[in-house]
């Protein structure tokens, strides 16, 4: 009788354990904890520092406390919106993941990862991003390209202030200008017309644009009046 009772007890214990395991497995998924969402694994523990999909099949990130991250950087190279959804194919203005005092523009690609280190064509326009993913503006790439305040690479004629010359610690002004701005011409590739980008050797470059000839100096400023040229 004792042996029979032990068998019954063991069977009951196994059944109870099985039910507990089934309940734990069924509990895996999203749950509310106070005012925030968490994700519980099959053992009833919060998932931390990992991505999980919601019922809408969109990715969300669980931070170090196991809470769903919102409106912040996630996993270093990604960003989640106010609903916790991973941003993709979208511009975001925020502070850098690495710190900073001002909000700046970033672009997150199709995979959700921030674009870094180079040029990226977005909606038909070219943009340049640094090693942190910050969208660049102004003169760049050895002052051969110009990016507007919107970050887009400019082409054609542009009336601009000259690039800042760090070696001279001053602006590289050429011929006198009343407002400190000069005409520059940028090819369809975005590259500035100047002596270093032309076929000529010397202080000036002469180029035909829309049927007319123009002269540019070594910095790319369009010249007016008399210009002394060797040869």
Which residues fall in each region the model found?
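Extracellular adhesion/carbohydrate-binding repeat motifs centered on closely spaced tryptophans
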Residues: 2-231
